[in-house]
């Protein structure tokens, strides 16, 4: 009957729970409470596993393997980001620095924490995002695909700038940023300095696929948390995300 009612976690826990209940003379209401709690716990765990698989994480790294004292990101800033309040406010996060500074590890750990907090995550590289939007172009389902991506509470676009971005990549990036505007958080990691962020997209984008005002609104409309992971010799870089920051009210932490 429990199988028919689709209560697999009650069925799995029932023998042990009922044996304990008999030995300790539990009230029937307590037995029911414990069994239903096991079902809820099991379903929550299954949902988290499903969401982790759907997110498409690259490595599975979490804060369990993160050494906050080894990062150039201040511990207080790490703690603030780990509260995930910025995700609830649909704020955006940009972390930049050379390879090997832990950008992707930290953002992936944050993304796992987002799922642990009962939210959804979509993880892309710029290349995989471009491929996803490109496949949707074949059957004219771009709007549906972008809408599906934006059902996630956090959208991660990892390692922007590792390769030159062509027109298709730029269009895919801006479609998602525009659709997520003031609705979802977008986290970006990049191996280029913030002052060079505006060089990775084709200059023709503003006059082709999207109008310039729409791009400005997409990039400037929500608050942005900017964190730089550059070595000490490269601190003080001018022009923090010149093409993106604009009128943002931002938290700018220098590392």
Which role fits each region the language model picked out?
Residues 3, 7-58:
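Interdomain "pre-motor" coupling segment immediately N-terminal to P-loop NTPase/helicase cores
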Residues 16-20, 91-96, 195-198:
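Short hinge/gating elements
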Residues 61-82:
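N-terminal pre-Walker A segment at the start of P-loop NTPase domains
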Residues 82-90:
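Phosphate-binding P-loop
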Residues 90-106:
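Walker A/P-loop nucleotide-binding motif
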Residues 109, 113:
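Active-site signature of alpha/beta-hydrolase-fold catalytic machinery across serine-
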């Amino acid at each position: 009957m429990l199988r028919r009612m689709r209560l697999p976690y009650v069925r799995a826990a029932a023998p042990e729970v009922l044996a304990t209940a008999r030995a300790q003379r539990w009230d029937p209401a307590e037995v029911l409470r414990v069994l239903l709690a096991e079902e809820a716990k099991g379903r929550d765990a299954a949902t988290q596993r499903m969401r982790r698989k759907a997110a498409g994480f690259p490595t599975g790294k979490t804060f369990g393997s993160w050494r906050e004292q080894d990062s150039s990101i201040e511990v207080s800033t790490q703690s603030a980001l780990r509260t995930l309040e910025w995700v609830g406010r649909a704020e955006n996060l940009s972390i930049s620095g050379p390879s090997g500074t832990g950008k992707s590890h930290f953002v992936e750990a944050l993304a796992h924490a987002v799922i642990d907090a009962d939210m959804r995550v979509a993880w892309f590289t710029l290349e995989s995002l471009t491929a996803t939007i490109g496949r949707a172009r074949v059957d004219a389902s771009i709007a549906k695909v972008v809408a599906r991506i934006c059902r996630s509470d956090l959208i991660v676009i990892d390692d922007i700038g590792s390769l030159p971005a062509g027109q298709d990549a730029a269009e895919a990036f801006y479609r998602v940023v525009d659709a997520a505007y003031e609705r979802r958080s977008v986290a970006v990691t990049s191996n280029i300095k913030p002052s060079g962020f505006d060089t990775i997209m084709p200059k023709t984008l503003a006059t082709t696929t999207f109008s310039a005002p729409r791009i400005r609104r997409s990039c400037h409309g929500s608050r942005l948390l900017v964190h730089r992971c550059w070595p000490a010799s490269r601190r003080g870089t001018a022009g923090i995300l010149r093409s993106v920051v604009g009128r943002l009210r931002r938290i700018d932490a220098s590392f």
